[in-house]
Each structure stands twice: as C-alpha cells, then as structure tokens.
Amino acid sequence: VSALASEALPSIVQVTNMSLEQVQSWFGTSSTVPTKSLGSGIIFNQDDKYLYIATNNHVVSNSNSLSVTFNDNKSVSGEVVGTDEESDLAVIKVKLSSLKDSTKKAIKVATLGSSDTLKVGQQAIVIGNALGYGQSVTTGVISALNREVSIQNEDSGKTYTQEMIQTSAAVNS
C-alpha cells in the first residue's frame, strides 16, 4: 500500500473554493458572507500551458476564486474549465507558468487505470484531502459494482441516479 500511495500522492491536490453565500439572519434580513470549501483533485493531464485536474462539481460550484495546493504545500490559482452537475464532476486548469520549478518536480500526472477490470473483494486504496487536514491514505475493498445511488445536488435541488463503485474505504471519517 505504501509503495502505491507514494506513487499516487504527487498527483493528488487540495482544491480550495472561495465563494459568497447569502445567509438569513434571525431577524429576516440577509447578508452576503464569504465561504470556503475544500476538496481533493487529481492531476490527469498536462499540455504545453496547463495542468488539468479532475475534482467534484460540488467543490467548485459558485466559485469566486479557486486555489490549488500541491503535495509540496505550494498553492496557485485555478480556473474552472467545465462542470457536470449530474455526475458531480468538474475539471479545473492551472497555468504551468504559475508553478515554481520545485513544484513541477514534486508533482506528476496520474496514471489512470480502467474500472472495467474491477472485481468485488479487490483491495481499494483511497487518497484524498480528508476534511481539509491534508493528504490522507486509507484502504478497504471493492464492496459493490454498479451500485445505484441517488444524489441530490445541493445547489439546484435536482436528484440524479448514478451507478457507482462502492468501497469500504472512507477518507472523510
């Protein structure tokens, strides 16, 4: 597990979203307050100008500014390229020119596999930014394939049903 985690960790980032949210007071008035949300991302592609990072739509929704923190704890601005509310996925990009050479040496594009070959009972390794405390690694097993899960989008209130891979590995607990 530690060898696989060491291989993958340079591809994992923390995404910080700063947004403005309308909140109601006890007296019926509303005000706009800054809010911060955190999530994980994975570097999945690079071209001559940008790194591309996959994250969750709910992490970047309503963003006023995005910050991406790499495994060397250096942060740069990110920009949303696209989102998909139904799958809760988003892609953000980071300018390569904004990265220090030391950061460029510390990170890498992830090697992605295929979920087509997964089997129930196989070991699963989950890596992510657990509750904003930094990178965490946990293990479990593939519990189910094609598990239908209904998810309600926090922003739109729409409910979507997706087929998911269920694992017993929890990174946020």
Residue ranges of model-derived segments:
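Serine-dependent protease modules
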Residues: V1-S173
